[in-house]
């Protein structure tokens, strides 16, 4: 293992790296965005899943990163220098993501890096960044597998995922016995993001007397979700808690359930339904009704920074607030904490940025307050449960006492067919 070290870039090195990136874009698949100005840009590199299983999320993160850079550049950039983003496509592959960050840091010599999508890809990527002494702000690697590494350079402004379904499970457990489902199914992808939160919910619900009639983790390679969904339907479980990581996984189960005329009274998924217009388009507006999902952000969040983000997003990309994928807000938050650190330290020195983010300072982002512990978890993160309701509208339902929460639709309405 190579020793940890920080690389300091001279102005000429940044210029050379920038020229190399621009020259390579047409042949390597990299893309870059930058503002105008005479000062040399602050070059920030990121590997994202622009193709492959996580491509919808990767594209959403890219929009979040790009919107942040655009907004920052409108006000003069960082330290009076425009921000330039450089992207590499990891095709949703853990080996490729490690190669990409090595290339960004060691060859292209970017000033800073942002993280990829998913816990699966964050683990190898963060190790590379740590080896070179780079701060690693990221918004989608919230699984225990990331924090168990105990790396000093990881900082995630999004909520830790292990307990994100706890508010949902507590709500079900507290239902009157006549309303509480008696049986539940827990189909899960083999993923370090989905599994911890699904299993935490299952533990709470079993203690509340909800009997598990199906629990299976599908292999990462060539999972047969259609067969799995049919097996869940055959149990007649009154509740389904789906450990999913993306829109395609959630869609596969929903479509199979509809074909089987199986409609659980309560249906929650760990991810997929939080992805706005992408989810609605995939399953149909009527089939979203009643589905629940955890997250730390939605377009109606009563947060001035979030409201400004929503306005800027719609102005740049079009559509309506409900179309915005929560991944874009997570990516934008990564930019916000980075900007705060750069401004506070008056530098793009990764060692200083790491030290600042570990100083117990509380920062404000579109997702709410952020304060990091020693392993980079946001210990003051807001956790919400959302539900799709008639419209379709994506609304906050839990905690019920939180500002902006509306009553839960229970039981879930029937599928559109």
Region annotations inferred by a language model:
Residues 4, 31-34, 43, 56-61, ...:
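Beta-alpha junction/loop-to-helix N-cap segments that form part of ligand/metal-binding clefts
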């Amino acid at each position: 293992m190579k020793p940890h070290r920080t690389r300091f870039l001279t102005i000429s090195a940044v210029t050379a790296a920038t020229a190399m990136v621009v020259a390579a874009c047409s042949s390597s698949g990299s893309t870059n965005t930058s503002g105008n100005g005479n000062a040399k840009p602050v070059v920030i590199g990121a590997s994202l899943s622009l193709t492959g299983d996580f491509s919808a999320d990767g594209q959403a993160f890219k929009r979040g990163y790009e919107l942040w850079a655009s907004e920052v550049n409108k006000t003069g950039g960082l330290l009076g220098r425009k921000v330039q983003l450089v992207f590499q496509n990891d095709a949703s592959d853990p080996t490729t993501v490690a190669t990409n960050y090595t290339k960004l840091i060691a060859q292209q010599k970017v000033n800073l890096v942002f993280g990829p999508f998913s816990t699966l890809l964050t683990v190898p990527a963060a190790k590379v960044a740590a080896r070179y002494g780079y701060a690693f702000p990221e918004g989608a690697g919230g699984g225990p597998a990331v924090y168990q590494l105990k790396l000093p350079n990881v900082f995630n402004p999004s909520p830790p995922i292990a307990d994100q379904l706890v508010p949902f499970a507590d709500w079900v457990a507290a239902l009157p016995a006549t309303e509480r489902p008696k049986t539940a199914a827990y189909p899960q992808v083999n993923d370090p993001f989905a599994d911890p939160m699904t299993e935490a919910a299952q533990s709470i619900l079993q203690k509340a007397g909800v009997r598990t009639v199906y629990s299976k983790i599908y292999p990462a390679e060539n999972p047969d979700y259609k067969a799995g969904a049919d097996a869940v339907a055959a149990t007649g479980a009154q509740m389904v808690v789906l450990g999913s990581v993306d829109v395609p996984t959630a869609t596969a189960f929903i479509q199979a359930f509809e074909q089987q005329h199986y409609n659980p009274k309560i249906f929650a998924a760990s991810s997929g339904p939080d992805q706005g217009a992408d989810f609605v388009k995939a399953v149909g507006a009527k089939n979203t009704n009643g589905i629940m999902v955890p997250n730390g952000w939605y377009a109606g969040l009563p947060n001035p920074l979030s409201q400004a983000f929503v306005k800027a997003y719609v102005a740049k990309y079009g559509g309506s607030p409900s179309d915005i994928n929560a991944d874009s807000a997570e990516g934008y938050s990564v930019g916000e904490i980075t900007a705060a650190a750069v401004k506070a330290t008056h530098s793009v020195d990764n060692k200083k940025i790491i030290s600042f983010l570990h100083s117990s300072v509380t920062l404000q982002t579109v997702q709410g307050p952020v304060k990091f512990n020693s392993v980079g978890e946001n210990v003051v993160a807001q956790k919400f449960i959302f539900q799709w309701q008639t419209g379709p509208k994506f609304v906050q339902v839990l905690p019920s006492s939180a500002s902006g929460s509306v009553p839960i639709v229970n039981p879930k309405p029937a599928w559109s067919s």
